[in-house]
From Swiss-Prot:
It comes from Orientia tsutsugamushi (strain Boryong). The gene is rnhA. This is Ribonuclease H. Mg(2+) 2 binds at D19, D143. Binds 1 Mg(2+) ion per subunit. May bind a second metal ion at a regulatory site, or after substrate binding. Belongs to the RNase H family.
Length: 168
């Protein structure tokens, strides 16, 4: 793994593109991260056999920030308005209200939002929303990675289902 060591004062930002994908929502899903810094690239993806698209979008963002071992200036690009609005508009109010919505309900995916909030404290993050499937190269790479994760999750879920049928 490449070490992306640099100071947060460095003017060259780490560029991160994230995406999540889910089949049947909830169902098998995947997340993808495309990271570039100077002349280095990193592509990572993962999966979950029972999840939602929003959880995969958040997981992609969390896993991307976990890749950074030091404090960075980060430009983070997502095609998820849920992530974009949540982190730039809603999260401060959620924290003030003890992670409850205005209806006194616990924020959906609170576990992931809390983790994401903790991770961003280490970095200087600029959040950018990009339209999905609009030709943005970084987003297209992240989308393909998320789809790979989703396909793996679908295969695992199918094998588990077949195993259950076999054992019954």
């Amino acid at each position: 793994m490449t070490n992306y060591a640099c100071s947060i004062t460095n003017n060259i930002p780490v560029k991160i593109y994230t995406d999540g994908a889910c089949s049947h929502n909830p169902g098998p899903g995947g997340w993808g991260v495309y990271l570039s810094y100077k002349n280095h690239e990193k592509k990572v993806y993962g999966s979950n056999i029972n999840t939602t698209n929003n959880r995969m979008e958040l997981t992609a963002t969390i896993e991307a920030l976990r890749l950074l071992k030091h404090s960075y200036k980060v430009e983070l690009y997502t095609d998820s308005q849920y992530v974009q609005m949540g982190i730039t508009k809603w999260i401060k109010k959620w924290i003030k209200n003890n992670w409850e919505t205005s209806n006194k309900q616990l924020v959906c995916n609170v576990d992931l939002w809390q983790l994401l909030y903790t991770l961003i404290q280490k970095h200087q993050v600029s959040w950018h929303w990009v339209r999905g499937h609009s030709g943005n190269i970084g987003n297209e790479i992240a989308d393909k990675l998320a789809t790979n994760g989703k396909i793996e999750a679908m295969k695992i879920a199918k094998n588990n289902e077949n195993t259950k049928k076999f054992l019954d």
